[in-house]
Amino acid sequence: MNKKKVLAVALALVATTPSLAEKAIDDSSKVREIDEVIVISQPKEQFLLRHQPLSSNVYAAGQMMNLGVRDLRELSSFVPNFAMPNYGSRYTSSMYIRGIGSRINSPAVGIYVDGAPLINKSSFNYHHFDVTRVDVLRGPQGTLYGMNTEGGLVRIYTKDPMNYQGTDIKLGMGSHGYQLLEASTYRKLNSKSALMLGGFYSGQNGFFRNEFNGQRADKYREGGGKMRFVWRPGTQWNISLGAHYEYTDQNGFPYGKMDLEHNTTANPSTNNQAKYRRNLVNSALCVNFKGNCFDFNSTTSYQYLKDFMRMDIDYMSTDFLLMEERQLQNAFTQELVMKSNRNRFWQWTQGGFFSAEWLKTNAPVYFGSDMNKFMSGTIRNAMYNAMVRSMSARFMRPGVTAEQAQQQAKDMIERQGGVNLDINLGTVPGIFRTPSYNLGLFHESSLNLTERFKVTLGLRYDYSHLSIDYLTSAKMTSLANIMGRKATSSIMSTLQNKAHNSFNQLLPKVGMSLDIDHVGSNIYAVVSKGYRAGGYNIQMFSDILSAELQKNSSQRGDYTVEHDAKAYKDIENTISYTPETSWNYEVGAHLNLFDHKLQLDLAAFYMQVRNQQISVMAGNYGFGRMMTNAGRSSSSGIEASLRGQAFNNNLSWMANYGFTHAVFKEYVDNVSTTGNMKAMDYKDKKVPFIPAHTFSASVDYRIPFNSMLKAITIGANVNAQGKTYWDEANSYSQAFYALAGAHATADFGRITVDLWGRNLTNTKYNTFAMGSLATGKMYYFGQRGNPFQCGIDLKFHL
């Protein structure tokens, strides 16, 4: 079955299911709002998500189990206009919503877990455990949630031990060495307090081998634990303390060389095996008080991250470049929120937010023997050509052509011993301290002008301050033999300085909602502003230092490159990038149809983006990725979501579609072509890494039994996306592709057995691709998507 057949089957399922619902119009099926069924305390919002002027999707634990979702990367495949591709490692957390996204540095999509924000982007990609509900909000959420929610927001909620009791154990195993163990217990200590304790282990041998050393290129092992204590000393108080620890050890970044002509991607083949290890702690204290006129909520969180990454950044078996990165992060956040709790003409929310992040990054770059040979050859050729030009001028005389003069110069150089050069670049160490602080003050009012029509007005003042304190250096030693004369030299460059910057923004929001019937259907329009913080590119320093060394390669003896205030100011301008801002214009509808047997959500949007932040290879040599600002871009599109129930709620189905047209409106960049810099205009080119189309569908049918076997559920799903361009020039891309999955679940009450399969048709596709000039020649690399996999999960509830 090819991908076209997969899509045809999925569309047929979706098309026929509404008719089944109409035929069974007299049954008891109802599609209920998930945030009505799984009630979560919301300290900021006044209304359920489908009664707000925004586009969103909500996923409950049972639905995610049927889809086979284990983390946010896998869930993103079933959310319209949301992409979080599965590539690299847990370090990688690239997320894109509506053409807005980020591969490095400041995120464009925020994540909250049980009401507390995750600060460091390196902590976004983690194992989902004990999750009861996930909300995905599309479009800027800056008024209530601040900077770095320009594309949208993901809210993850875990089980509350006051509402959920018992012990859950989950065992899983599957092909490619997949293993899973999760155990958690939920107990009420008394009528006012409850405790949750849990732990997990997960592992997989991986899908790809490193052709150079035979190791599994993407194997992983991870484990951790969590706790949550809830105390309700009175009817008005709710206090929750939670902590989560996770350790990850994996081989990562299995990027193989691409053949663009034949559209193939090879297995990875690197002489240095890429690795990633991470210790991650997230903790939060939430205090909620329900007063007579208002609710008060305080959320205090602390986050700790310590990781190690090793990446062969030439991505080949040759010994060019190796990068390591060690991050040590401590972060603190505090948010205070008050909101009215009476259903009156005026309902309001207001509060303040503060965060502080202290981040130390140790990021050395190692130059291998092949890089030394490459640099030696490059500089040697430059010296040789300069000597030939200088000497040939002296041989010019009447009757001698320029070619003859050049040949005479070359012959003389060779007779005198030629030009030979051996260079050793060694290691470029780098220690970077980048603390950042953020302050936000916000207010949002909802005015119920009539029974059916309400207006939402919001405004946030957001201030951020960031700084960098860096120490890095590079040394190039050379042994030259020029026409029989030997000379040694050493060129040293040390960069040590501090810089800081501050940004502030006003983030307004204006929304309108109109109820169009008496069953909760409504239409809406909203205008809002998004904001993404600026920052510093620490991976630029290797390129800056290498350029300095090459520029001064003709110096003799021992030479130290000096830097004055102007030089450091130029460096600051080189490594910094400015904030990205956007305006979002959106209209939509939330419709309840056929007596609540069908839900339909529609949205159309247009976004204007200024100073769009784009991840590109750093400078001429490509020693790392850097963030740069494009001039202007725009993004427009649509979203549609359908959910339905039939046959007394035994049949459930959904379908989602998203379309995004994201293009540069003004972006001119200097690119290296055969050693020369050339201005490249990317106007009207598609923004890279953004799928133009996203589609997903699923159907599950539950067959009840009156025996020890309570029910059997059979389900199928499909998700698809593309076309996705991989660079600003739109020179190569991933075509539209589809992945099919299925599962069969047997429910024995306290025991559940689930058989599952993913990528049933073994579709070939890439989740990521890029070009690299690290070796002096442009090569393209990509990571293939995971092939077919199947397995079994056993769940016990005691």
Residue ranges: model-predicted function:
Residues 114-140:
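Short acidic/polar hinge/loop motifs at secondary-structure boundaries
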Residues 31-65, 93-94, 109, 134:
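N-terminal periplasmic "start-of-domain" segments of outer-membrane beta-barrel proteins
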Residues 37, 359, 372, 531, ...:
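C-terminal beta-signal and adjacent terminal beta-strands/loops
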Residues 209-215, 253-269, 314-321, 364-429, ...:
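Solvent-exposed loop segments that connect transmembrane elements
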